A protein has these predicted regions:
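HhH-family (HhH-GPD) DNA N-glycosylase catalytic core used in base-excision repair
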Residues: 1-199
């Protein structure tokens, strides 16, 4: 058995089996996940995965340094790219997020150290989530969302942040009968915690 959502496409199966929930500590990979989740706003994750390589090409292999330096010419280039999500507002937001990401790195040493301090460096296994009872947001994603917005990040509401935390492994939301659930618990430090829902 596996998480129910994984079987919708080849891209979703690969993403579930190889990436989703695996603790991630490389800053550029964290920026990639944050950008993908932010670009997803109002869209399906399956669509984002289908367009992932286009997004990678448009956003300089998800290099925050390069994206932060994008100009109006780059925005025009992206808008004219085939298969791209053509939202000027989102594209500008990703450039702003890259700038905020670099500022946070400078302040905290790395985005990794900033993010993982919220869980003391451990993957969080919320009680009940392994049964498939996952919220769209919780108190943790509310707190991180609030802090990111204060730092100038855009498209980082609590629902998007919750999905980001699932993606980068800070939250292990695989279902208990999914092989990945126990595999990740055996391979990485984790902590079982009681869910606290946001208001």
């Amino acid at each position: 058995m596996a998480c129910q959502w994984k079987n919708s496409s080849a891209e979703m199966i690969s993403y579930h089996d190889k990436e989703w929930g695996v603790p991630t500590h490389e800053d550029q990979k964290l920026f990639e996940y944050l950008l993908l989740e932010s670009m997803q706003a109002g869209l399906s994750w399956a669509l984002i995965l289908r367009k992932r390589e286009t997004l990678r090409s448009c956003f300089a292999n998800f290099s925050p340094e390069k994206v932060a330096a994008f100009t109006e010419e780059d925005i025009a280039r992206i808008m004219h790219t085939e298969n791209m999500i053509k939202s000027v507002r989102k594209i500008r937001a990703m450039i702003q997020n890259a700038k905020a990401f670099l500022a946070l790195q400078k302040e905290e040493g790395s985005f990794d150290s900033y993010l993982w301090k919220f869980s003391d460096g451990k993957s969080l296994c919320y009680q009940g989530h392994e049964k498939g009872n996952m919220p769209s947001k919780n108190a943790l994603s509310e707190a991180i969302s609030k802090d990111l917005k204060k730092r100038g990040f855009q498209y980082t509401g609590p629902v998007i942040v919750y999905s980001f935390l699932q993606a980068c492994g800070l939250i292990n939301d695989h279902e208990e009968d999914c092989p990945c659930y126990q595999t990740l618990r055996k391979a990485y430090p984790y902590q079982e915690v009681e869910e606290i829902f946001s208001c």
